[in-house]
Amino acid sequence: MFVLKNFKIVFSYFPIVLQYILNVALICLGVVLSVFLMKEVIQFMQELKLDGNESSYHLIDSIVVFFLYFEFIVMIIKYFQMNFHFPLRYFIYIGITAIVRLIIIDHDSPLDLLLYACAIFVLISALFIANSKMMRWDLE
């Protein structure tokens, strides 16, 4: 009986310990993403100074990568603001941005572009549903 009581005590602290580990890992990830975001800003400024032969696709790609870093950082901030909960809509924003980046980079095949556009349509539809009042518990 004594052993069973000790297991209950240990298992009651287990989720708390895992939550702390997750929080520390997300803080570290946020710091690393912030460093990469600043690196992307510096690289973007250097690309603007160069009036060379760089294609506009590379410049747009760097802007979209900046927004991907930014969205991940915002998602981590929202995680802590919303009592350790990731809002679904931020994952959808990241998915849409990633597909737009893919369209900018790989625009050779018309069939692939059509499939990417369909994927964006599905994600926007999911975003519309996720932003409805019925699904948004954070507005209450």
UniProtKB/Swiss-Prot annotation:
InterPro entries: P_starv_induced_PsiE (IPR009315), P_starv_induced_PsiE-like (IPR020948). Disulfide bonds: none annotated. It holds the Pfam family PsiE. GO terms for cellular component: plasma membrane. The chain crosses the membrane at residues 16-36, 57-77, 85-105, 110-130. It is a multi-pass membrane protein. Keywords: Cell membrane, Membrane, Transmembrane, Transmembrane helix. Belongs to the PsiE family. This is Protein PsiE homolog.
